[in-house]
Amino acid sequence: MAQYEAVIGLEVHVELKTRSKIFCDSTTEFGGDPNTHVCPVCLGLPGVLPVVNKKVVEYAIRAALALNCQIAGFSKFDRKNYYYPDMPKNYQISQYDLPIARNGYIEIDVNGKRKRIGITRLHMEEDTGKLVHQGTITTTPFSLVDYNRAGVPLIEIVSEPDLRSPEEARQYMEKLRAVIQYTGVSDCKMEEGSLRCDANVSVRPAGSIAFGTKTEIKNLNSFKALQRALAYEIERQIDVLEEGGRVVQETRTWDEGKGITLPMRTKEEAHDYRYFPDPDLVPLVIDREWVEDIRRSLPELPDEKRERYMREYALPAYDAGVLTSTRELAGFFEACVQGYPNPKIVSNWIMGDLLRLLNAGNIEIQDCPVKPGQLVSMLRLIEKGTISGKIAKTVFEEMFATGRDAEDIVKEKGLVQISDEGAIAAIVDQVIAGNPRTVEDYRSGKEKALGFLVGQVMKATRGKANPELVNRLLKEKI
């Protein structure tokens, strides 16, 4: 079997978080009743004219700068002509040959090394309406159209074909989402459609420089779907080639239930859309000083914050990467460190117990029932010896479930750590007397035996004995 490599490029659509749409003043609010957030402009009624929302241009420049793009001094809007029920004008206002930004990049970690993924272009366009299918897209007897989304401002970010695996594609998407979220121009919620992705993928013999025939995959509404769809499509294309067939250039949809891609239509080329400049919109002349003002207003971005955490807090690269993966998580961490200046301990609790509980409950960090001040208070109890680290885990789960403070839970449940040496010594004596064989094992050099004896003492005290004191007394008495 010949060895193949995948060649992947992503087209990512990001809805911008402006109050009004790109060419009219209809609201962009998510979740209204169908066809209530519309006006004659976004419905494409005769006699209306679009007017560019300046905030959209600002947000596009802001995102482009964060992605290391070069901003155009001159840009324009074009009509992309096609016929589809979710497009009321029968054309989409987009940008073709003069996008607002080009030649950017972001970096991802691949096998412990930084890999730069090129960004071909970033351009502005209006979103389409939304088709609501009765059933799946391939089985529905009819579809309904909701135009609330029509005219919502988008930026499309087109990557170079620099990705070589589904895992790299997922990393790229996660990093792209983080960068955009940090800028504040979008919430990037895939479940609400404010971050969407189409994937172009082909395969070629390993070592070849020629591209294979690509397919485009749509309906990728999660990182998991992106990774699974690419893995399936790569395998499908290799199977076609191995059997002597020919990969067809087409658009395919991802069927999450069946775990397969299905053909939708033949893949269009640029000339199929008959692009031409929109005669109702004047070209954009971008003032350089305005661009520099926007650049100066950018916040600390994920890579910069990650490097600072490693330098300032002495965190490992992995910890720093996880903690800076979202702006909200980084904010939670920094709020904790302000109150409890031991970054590694804070990092361990956030990356361990906190993220585990958040993931299990499918809860975002901004909705976390445990606030930074509450976590700090619990860490202070451990530091003072009021509770042990083991008991703290039980306390933290109760805090997460109820939102209550650690002090109240410890007091109510009687979880204060036993640090009375005499009381612990008596229990240690009982454990030593009851486990003579284990005691002899420890005396003969078996270190693990001590762990068993410590466990027996902790069991007898329901986990409340001071573990350092238990260890010392056992060693002294044995």
UniProtKB/Swiss-Prot annotation:
PROSITE patterns: GATB. The keyword Nucleotide-binding applies. Its EC number is 6.3.5.-. Keywords: ATP-binding, Ligase, Nucleotide-binding, Protein biosynthesis. It holds the Pfam family GatB_Yqey. The keyword Ligase applies. GO terms for biological process: glutaminyl-tRNAGln biosynthesis via transamidation; translation. It comes from the Bacteria. GO terms for molecular function: asparaginyl-tRNA synthase (glutamine-hydrolyzing) activity; ATP binding; glutaminyl-tRNA synthase (glutamine-hydrolyzing) activity. It catalyses: L-glutamyl-tRNA(Gln) + L-glutamine + ATP + H2O = L-glutaminyl-tRNA(Gln) + L-glutamate + ADP + phosphate + H(+); L-aspartyl-tRNA(Asn) + L-glutamine + ATP + H2O = L-asparaginyl-tRNA(Asn) + L-glutamate + ADP + phosphate + 2 H(+). Allows the formation of correctly charged Asn-tRNA(Asn) or Gln-tRNA(Gln) through the transamidation of misacylated Asp-tRNA(Asn) or Glu-tRNA(Gln) in organisms which lack either or both of asparaginyl-tRNA or glutaminyl-tRNA synthetases. The reaction takes place in the presence of glutamine and ATP through an activated phospho-Asp-tRNA(Asn) or phospho-Glu-tRNA(Gln). Belongs to the GatB/GatE family. GatB subfamily. Heterotrimer of A, B and C subunits. HAMAP family: GatB. This is Aspartyl/glutamyl-tRNA(Asn/Gln) amidotransferase subunit B.
